[in-house]
């Protein structure tokens, strides 16, 4: 091996080594080292003529005509491989991004750099990646979008600028995952224990895709979305899509195996669509072949689809559509192992959603209406006997309307084709055993759900 120790200005060094290379691969990066930087060079040539140049004393390098810049404490240039290895306080800058690290390798042939050690990459829009290592691929005619690939569980801070024209400061979203890939200024792909933190929600999953240009995010593989604030909620499912506008989440859709849980309502269905405003749930829609369930501690509603209206995240109305069934605990004055129930083509439940002095209380049922082949079984306190022996009322009709007062049945109105039966226990003074309440009170499943159930048509 032939070793030549040369101490000269880099202008002369470039004149000797770079001119022929510039003609061989004209479309890739041709490095230049500006004069006047005090850089020292040591050139080593092996038996095959391959040259390795050791640079020290601080170096500055550029790709001719490409608007980028590399600085470091020292570097090694491998001419045959067209590769530059930089060590110590490495900085890479270009109009689209800046990258800093402890060490960096720049590959001239494909305009690609590999950074290691305390990597910080900042895009032109302010989004920042931090991690142990990263690969940055510059934009080229063959690769229009820049690309950043970072393993080793990096953290990305996405800057979400205000587009509403109100002059609000930008919000940020933090993404942590085992591997993150960024394309351009708006696309982010994350995989492996993904966590996304926004001012209004926390989202997790094993993989995620985010498109800030279209205010869209998708989470996959056991995803979960948790709303923040005083009235939080949680949504899980097979795949969760998040739609936003002006940095505010508007819709969160989970399918299949949707499960939504809030303070006032729990929903279980194949698909669940949550509508939001001001970081609070306003509406929840559930549907699917497997039937939709709306559950609370004292009530459950089942139907092909369910639409819950809940302004300010307090339930005001629940609509159960097609083959609807609802059951609830009996009145507070009744002790029974059976629950009251109601069925019909549709069931609409109205709640008192006004916020009182006790903001922790749940909305009380105010009215429930079943329409179309309606049936109802409910139990009332028996004035002649103990609480364990209630009066039983079973009615049928086209429409059944039940009004509640203080969570107790006040009136029952049956419209068209009204039939029914009232069963009261025998008086305690007769000594006879009170009449038994039929043990089977649930209506037979005479109507099977259709093979395919379409979601309800609701305004967006």
PLM segments and residue spans:
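Bacterial N-terminal signal peptides
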Residues: 7-17
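Positively charged n-region of N-terminal signal peptides that target proteins for export
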Residues: 1-6
């Amino acid at each position: 091996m032939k070793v030549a120790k040369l101490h000269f200005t880099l202008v002369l060094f470039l004149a000797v080594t770079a001119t022929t290379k510039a003609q061989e691969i004209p479309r890739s990066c041709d490095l230049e080292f500006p004069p006047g930087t005090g850089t020292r060079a040591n050139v080593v040539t092996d038996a095959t003529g391959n040259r390795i140049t050791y640079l020290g004393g601080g170096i500055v390098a550029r790709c001719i005509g490409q608007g980028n810049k590399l600085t470091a404490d020292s570097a090694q240039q491998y001419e045959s491989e067209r590769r530059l290895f930089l060590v110590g306080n490495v900085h890479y800058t270009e109009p689209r991004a800046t990258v800093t690290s402890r060490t960096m390798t720049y590959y001239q042939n494909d305009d690609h750099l590999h950074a290691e050690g305390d990597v910080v990459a900042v895009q032109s829009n302010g989004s920042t990646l931090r991690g142990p290592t990263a690969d940055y691929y510059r934009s080229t005619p063959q690769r229009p979008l820049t690309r950043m690939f970072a393993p080793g569980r990096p953290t990305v801070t996405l800057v979400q600028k205000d587009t509403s024209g109100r002059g609000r400061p930008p919000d940020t979203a933090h993404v942590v995952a085992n591997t993150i890939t960024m394309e351009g200024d708006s696309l982010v792909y994350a995989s492996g224990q993904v966590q996304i933190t926004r001012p209004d929600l926390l989202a997790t999953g094993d993989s995620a895709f985010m498109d800030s240009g279209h205010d869209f995010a998708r989470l996959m593989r056991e995803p979960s979305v948790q709303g923040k604030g005083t009235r939080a909620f949680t949504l899980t499912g097979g795949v969760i899509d998040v739609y936003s506008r002006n940095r505010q989440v508007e819709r969160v859709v989970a399918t299949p195996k949707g499960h939504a849980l809030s303070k006032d309502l729990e929903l279980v269905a194949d698909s669940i669509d949550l509508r939001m405003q001001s970081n609070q749930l306003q509406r929840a829609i559930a549907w699917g072949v497997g039937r939709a369930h709306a559950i609370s501690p004292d009530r459950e509603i089942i139907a092909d689809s369910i639409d819950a209206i809940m302004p300010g995240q307090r339930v005001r109305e629940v609509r159960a559509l097609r083959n609807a069934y609802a059951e609830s605990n009996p009145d507070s004055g009744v002790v029974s192992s059976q629950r009251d129930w109601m069925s019909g083509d549709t069931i609409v439940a109205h709640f008192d959603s006004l916020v009182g002095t006790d903001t922790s209380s749940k909305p009380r049922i105010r009215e429930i209406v079943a329409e179309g082949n309606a049936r109802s079984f409910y139990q009332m306190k028996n004035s002649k006997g103990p609480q364990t022996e209630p009066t039983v009322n079973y009615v049928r009709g086209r429409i059944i309307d039940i009004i509640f007062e203080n969570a107790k049945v006040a009136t029952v109105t049956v419209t068209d084709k009204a039939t029914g039966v009232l069963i009261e226990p025998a008086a305690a003074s007769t000594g006879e055993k009170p009449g038994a309440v039929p043990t089977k009170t649930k209506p037979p499943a005479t109507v099977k759900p259709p093979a395919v159930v379409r979601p309800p048509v609701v305004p967006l």
